[in-house]
Structures are given as structure tokens and as C-alpha cells.
Amino acid sequence: MTTTRTRMYAGAAAAATALSLLAGATSATAESSEPEPTAGAAPDPATARADLPPATTGFCAFTPMADQTYSTWVGLPPDPKRPRQWGADLVTLETNQGKITIVLDRTKAPCAVESFVFLVKQGYFNKTKCHRLTAYHTPPYALSVLQCGDPLGTGWGDPGYWFRDEFKGVNALPNWPDFPDGSRKNYVRGTLAMANAGPDTNGSQFFLVYDDSRLRPDYTVFGRVTAPGMAVLDKIAKAGVKPGEEYYPEDGAPALPVRIMTARRGGA
């Protein structure tokens, strides 16, 4: 990872910026006087494309990013007027560190699930790295996630389209104890959520929470990691962050390299 792009910086005491879980890229942003970790992706301006299709006209309105850099264009997901908003889908990420099975919850985020399943079917996640591990455990900061879904492996990659945020799952999360107003949520261990670059900029990057994490309620929750998958996450987290690549030792490439060999529908 280079330091020329903007990056998600966690709110370590030494940092004057707030960490953001960025999808497609990373972006350090100031947040009043209290720096803290965040989750997101920052856009990278690029030459507009004239050959992109229009946005879909169904419930989710998947919208091509004409002015964004994307890594792998595989088209736009199906977008029915009435997508299924019940039940769950299983997806297994076959990684070099073990199988991580995730449960996608259509009741919480039907558009995120529709997009994720589409990308799985297209082989979008195959042979991609999980490029980022965060390990902020010092109070009052908390951000413990593995971030994946970028074919570039840099934090910049995306599928070439955006879709809107869905907050039903976020609203169901418990408030962080010090924030009873809900301005910070406890993205609890096992949560599966979308990274983003700001409101309504979901793409392909996602994060898996291996320990309770304090974040703004800005990241679409669309599922959970199964118990066997959590064991794999714990192994990755225990190895820590690869030293020497980033500004903070709590945030960077995982020391134990993680590569999604294949992503497929169904359980183990």
C-alpha cells in the first residue's frame, strides 16, 4: 500500500484525523476535536466514460460511476422493482487461511445482498486480497475489522457502480455505551458491513468485524460471519498488522496475508 492515496486512519492519540472505512479507496477526515476510527472508501477522479449503461430503474437504482476509477467492470446487478426482502443467502469465502462463511440478510439490506450475490456469481472476488486489518483496542477507540472486496488490493478498487445506504441493520445495532444518542454504534463482533466513501457510495468493499467496534452509524450492515468463519478471522487478527507499511501500527495490511481464492454461494 502506498501513502499517496488518501487512507482510512484510525483515531489513535497521535492522529488528528478520524479513521474511515472507505470502499474503493481510503480517506482521512477530521471529526471535530475527537479523532476516531471510521470505515470508508475515497473516490479517485478519472476520465468520464461514454460507454457506460444508465442507472438501473428498479428498487436499488445501481448507478455507474462515470468519473471513478474501477478495477473490474462486470456489469450492473439485477434490479427488480420488488426485490426479495426476506430470508438469507449463504456465501463462502474460500481463503488461503481457511473458509469464511457469511450469512447475507435480505431483511436488513436487500440491495447490498443483491449486489454482493451478483459479484460472487461474476467471480469478482476470486483471487483478491483482503488488503486491510485494523487493531485499535485502546479506549476510547475501537476498530477491529478485516477489510476485503477490492480486486486492486490497494483500497481504491470498486465495481464501477454505487448503490444507496440501507440502515435497517444499522439501527438494530446497540448504541456504543458512551453514546446513548446513537451517534456511535457498536458494530458487534461477527458483523458484516459495507465500506463506503460517504453517503450512498457502496460498491464492492466490505468489512468483517472480529471484535466490537465503535463507528458512526454510516455503514450498511448486510449480514454476519458464522462461528467457524470467526475462528479464521481470529487467527488472522491474532497475527496482527504487517509492520512498516502504514502510518499507524494498528492499521495496514494483515501480517498473515489473506487472499480470497474463490467466493461461492452456499455453506461449507
Task: List PLM regions with ranges.
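Cyclophilin-like peptidyl-prolyl cis-trans isomerases
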Residues: 2-11, 18-268
